[in-house]
């Protein structure tokens, strides 16, 4: 049995790509996209017709409306391949604007529903800022499910759980990157790999906290750098994995054992944390890694959104 098939016994496998042709071979249950992945996909020749059709379907001169149409077009194509849910991301430039995030999420869901897609099959991705979490809380009350992304700390995870969000995406690889860079020449890949990988440990803490205190919010590990990180999180609710790493899992038959479980979480000695705004901001301020990676992630996604706009502009002008 391949590592991928073994992993699927413990964890829902999600494809992390906008390239829906690439995910067919791995039979994922769900899929996630983000501005960077969509930007990468739309530059491939095989997706040019989809891009041009989305521009026509938008029936708008607004680049913002056209990009929303492109995101939903890719999401619909992905949903024709997978049995589960697709995650579509709100513009990162709205990360500190609760009202605008809510409005954008409602608009994206309306576009999906206009194409016959039930809102239950769509997760709206929102950056895990305080303002983003408040938006997710409002959206939950209106039946719109959210995937809280750019999550790097337990403080963010606790705030999301208290808001009753559907799912969170802690970023394993980016946490690993920060600690590796911070350690410099003192980084020991053996001592700080496997179960001691700082990204793996972060997800383990969050998973155990959620299960210990019976939060229904799903935990989906994301942003992996290697197979070891994935295998160490076998048993996590979901793991979203790039096509390259899915291919490696499919080509290996090395054993995969369950590492995360509700039983282990319930046996752990865990202190409950406050989830109010001042506690959230204090804990984020005290966590240099989480603060820096959240800010960096928002900047990177915003930059790719701007690049996507530049790519769309000539198509809009020609339509």
Curated annotation (Swiss-Prot):
Its EC number is 2.2.1.2. Keywords: Cytoplasm, Pentose shunt, Schiff base, Transferase. GO terms for cellular component: cytoplasm. It is an enzyme of class 2 (transferase). CDD domains: Transaldolase_TalAB (cd00957). Homodimer. Belongs to the transaldolase family. Type 1 subfamily. This is Transaldolase. It comes from Ralstonia pickettii (strain 12J). The lineage of its organism: Bacteria, Pseudomonadati, Pseudomonadota, Betaproteobacteria, Burkholderiales.
């Amino acid at each position: 049995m391949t590592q991928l098939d073994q992993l699927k016994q413990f964890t829902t496998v999600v494809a992390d790509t906008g390239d829906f042709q690439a995910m067919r071979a791995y039979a994922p249950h769900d899929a996630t996209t983000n501005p960077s992945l969509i930007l990468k996909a739309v530059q491939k020749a095989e997706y040019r017709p989809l891009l041009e059709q989305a521009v026509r379907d938008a029936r708008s001169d607004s680049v913002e409306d056209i990009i929303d149409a492109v995101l939903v077009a890719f999401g619909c194509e992905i949903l024709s391949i997978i049995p589960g849910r697709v995650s579509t991301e709100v513009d990162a430039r709205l990360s500190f604007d609760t009202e605008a995030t809510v409005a954008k999420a409602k608009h994206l869901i309306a576009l999906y529903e206009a194409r016959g897609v039930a809102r239950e099959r769509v997760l709206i991705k929102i950056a895990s800022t305080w303002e983003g979490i408040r938006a997710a809380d409002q959206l939950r009350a209106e039946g719109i499910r959210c995937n809280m992304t750019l999550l790097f700390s337990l403080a963010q995870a606790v705030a999301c759980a208290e808001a009753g969000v559907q799912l969170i995406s802690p970023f394993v690889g980016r946490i690993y990157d920060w600690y590796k860079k911070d350690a410099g020449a003192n980084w020991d890949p053996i001592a700080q790999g496997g179960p001691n990988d700082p990204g793996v440990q972060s997800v383990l803490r969050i998973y155990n906290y959620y299960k210990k205190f019976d939060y229904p919010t799903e935990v989906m590990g994301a942003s992996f750098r290697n197979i070891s990180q994935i295998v160490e999180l076998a048993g996590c609710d979901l793991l979203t994995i790039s096509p390259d790493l899915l291919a490696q899992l499919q080509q290996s038959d090395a054993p995969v054992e369950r590492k995360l479980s509700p039983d282990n979480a319930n046996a752990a000695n865990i202190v409950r944390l406050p989830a109010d705004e001042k506690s959230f901001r204090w804990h984020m301020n005290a966590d240099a890694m989480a603060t820096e990676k959240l800010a960096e992630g928002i900047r990177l996604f915003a930059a790719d959104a701007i690049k996507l706009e530049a790519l769309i502009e000539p198509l809009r002008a020609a339509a």
